[in-house]
Amino acid sequence: GAWQVKKQYTQVGSYLQVPDPENRLCIDGSFSMFAYIWPSLHPKVGAQAVCGRYDDFNNIGYAFGIDETGHLGFIVADGKEFDAVLSEIPLQRHIWYFIGASYDASTGRATLHQMGVVNRYNSLWGKVTPMDYDSHVSETLRFKPKHAPDISFLVGGTWDFHANRGKFVNELYSGKVDRPGVVSRALSREEFDHICSGGKPPKNDILAYWDTSVGYTDTGIGDTVTDTGPHGLHAIGVNKPVRAQTGWNWNGRNDCFRLAPEEYGGIEFHDDAIIDCGWDVTHRLTIPDNLKSGVYAIRLRAGEGTGLGEEYIVFFIRAKTPRAPIALLIPTASYLAYANDHLTFDAQMAQPIVGQTPIVSDIDIEVYQSPEFGLSTYDHHRDGAGVCYSSYRRPIVSLHPKYRNPMNGVTWQFPADLSIVAWLEHCNYDYEVLTDEDLHREGVDSITPYKCVITGTHPEYYSETMLDATEDFVVGGGRLIYMGGNGYYWNVDFCEDEPWCMEVRKLDSGMRAWNAKPGEHYMQTTGQKGGLWKNLGRPPQKALGVGFISQGFESCRPFRRMPDSWHRTVSWITEGIEGEIIGDFGLAHGGAGGIEMDRYDLEKGTPPHARIIASSGGHTDNYMLVCEEVLYAFPGMTGTYDHRIRADMVYFTSSNNGAVFSTGSIAFGQALPCHNFDNNVSKLLANLVDAFSKDGSLPGGAWISDEKQWR
C-alpha cells in the first residue's frame, strides 16, 4: 500500500548536552569558565563552539568558540548582538591547551586565557618545538550576557534554529575536551594558573564541574559525564562522543584507563558523527507469528521506483522456539563495520588494492554527499580520526540486496550472503536464522539447539562473547561450517545501553584503514583491548583451523584437492566430485578461491589433526601477504611468488562429536548459484551439511584413531 511520508531531519555531530531544569547556568552576575581542549579540525573550515550556553540564532548567551581564523574567543550576547574577547595567537591542531575566561559583572571586564599544556607525550609537537601557545587578553565588553531559559549548556556545539527543522545544534566542534567547568565569580590569573596545573576549581564557587575522568570501571565507561559540583548537572552524550581517550595530562606510561583514569579525561567530538537519526516513526509493521524464520525485506518505492526511488529495509526473523537442525548465523556485526563506507571516494589505496577502476552508482554518490548516512569503521571523520563506532539507527544502503561494492564490482557482505540463503532455499534445507547480536546477547545458548551452524561469507568482526559461544558450541558437539575468509579478525563489542551501536579500536597490526592513537587502544564499551584477536592470544586458526593471509579482489582461482582429501576419515566430503579441481567458476571473478583468503597454520593454532581438503593457488601479484605476517618487508610477498598466499579448505573434529569445516575464501559462497546450483562447490557443501545436520557420529568416525598416525 501507499504510505504518507514527511521530510525528516538528522542531527549530525557528537556533543554533550546538560539538562538544567533550574537554570543554574543562567548566570546573572560574575562568572568564569574553563576547560582543557585539543582541537583536531583545521580552523579554516568554519566556526566551532567549544562549550557554553549559547543560542546562535537569537544571539543570546555565552560560550567559548573558535573563529574561522583559528582564534579562541569568549563570546557573550544580549539577544540582539554579540561581543567577544579573542586570543592573540591561533590554536594549533592536536595541541593541548588550557582555556579560561572570566567575566566581572560589576565592571563589564572580560579576560581570556589560553595556555599550552604540552608535555612529552600528549600533543602533536614536543617540547623542542619553539611554538608560542599562550595568550592573555582583557577587554571591557559593551554589554552583559542575557540568557534564554529554553536552551541548555552544550559541550561541542551551539544552538541554532531553522524554520523547517526547528532547533538544532550547529557550529560543531571537532577535538577533545577535558574537565570543563563553570564557577560563580571572576577568577584571578593565579586561580586559573592553579587549575591549569591540575588543581581543582574553588569548591565553594562551583556551579558545574564535569570531571571527565570520573566514572571509569574495569568494564569501561558510559556516555554520561559526571558533574561533581553541588547541583549534579550531569552531561549526556549525543551521537556518542568518544571516551577512553587520553587527556591533557597523559604521560605515556599507561596505555589503559584502568591503570590511570585521571589521565583519561579526554572526550573526543566529531562534527560528522552519527549514531541515531532520531526520526519519528513513519509506519509500523506487525510480523505474523507464523512467519518462517529467514531473511526478509520490505521494498519501498517512490516515483518510478527505480534507482534512488527504490529501497529495501532488510530484517531477519528468528525462530521463537528453534526446531530446525541448521542455523544460518547472519554476520550483522560485520555488516555494521562496513555500513555506508566511503572507501571508493576517500581511500587512496582503493584502486590499487582492488586492481581495477571503481565504478560508482547513484546511491554511492548520494551516500557520499549526505553526512546524514554516517560513516563506516573503514572511514575517517572530517578531522582525520578513525571511525570507531557504527550504528544501525540510520539508513544503510550496503544492506540493499541489489547493492554491488563499487570498488571490486561484486557483491559484498549481505548481498554476497544471499548466495548462501539462495542455496539453502534451493536445496530445500530446514534451517533458521539468527544474528550476531543474538549470539552476543545470549551466548552459546542461542545456538545450542542446532546441530549445524553456517556462517556468512565474511564474519570479520567478533566480540569475545561471540567467540566464546562459537568455541563452546563446537566443544559441546556442535558442527560449524565457516563459509568465509578473513573471519574472527577484529575484536569488537556492542554498547550495553545502545545495542544497535558497535565499537572497534584498530591498532598497530592488521589490514586496517586507521590506527587508534597512542594510549587509546582499550574500548569504552567493555574495557577490553581492541585490535586483532590474533594479538590477543586468540588467532582464528585456533577456532577455525585457518586464518587471514591475503586479499586481492580483482580475480579468483579454483581450488585443487589436496592429498588429505582422499583419507578415509574425510573422503566423504568430496564424494560425488570428479577430478581434482573444485570451483573453477563463481559470481566473484570466476572462481571459488579468492577476494580474501585464509590458510592452515600450525604455528598459529590450527589443530594438529586438521585435514587440508583443498587449496587454491596461482593467484596474481595483486594478492599480497597481509601486513601482520610481515616482520621485514622484501620482494616476493605476492601471489605468484609466495606459497603461503592461498585459500585452504580445512576440516577437523572436536570433542563430543563436534566438528569444523572452513572454506577459507570469501568467494566460495558466491560460487554456489552457478549452473543453477548444480556444481561441485554445491555438492561439497551439501555433503557437509547433510552430515553435520544429522544425529549420531560423523562419517569417517570409525577410523578417527588414524588421525594419530596420519601426520
Task: Set out the residue ranges of the language-model regions.
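Extracellular glycan-associated modules
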Residues: 1-243
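Signal that preferentially marks extracellular ectodomain short beta-strand elements
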Residues: 22, 164-168, 271, 275-291
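Solvent-exposed loop/turn segments at secondary-structure junctions
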Residues: 57, 160-161, 217, 332-336, ...
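Structural recognition of the beta-strand scaffold that forms the well-ordered cores
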Residues: 75, 208-211, 326-330, 432-435, ...
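Aromatic-Pro/Gly-enriched surface loop or interdomain linker
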Residues: 240-275, 302-446, 696-697, 702-710
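Helical hinge/lid and interdomain linker segments adjacent to catalytic or ligand-binding clefts
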Residues: 272-273, 284-286, 290-292, 409-496, ...
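Short, aromatic- and glycine-rich surface loops/edge beta-strands on solvent-exposed regions
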Residues: 294-300
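Glycine-rich, aromatic-lined ligand/substrate-binding cores of catalytic
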Residues: 498-687, 691-692
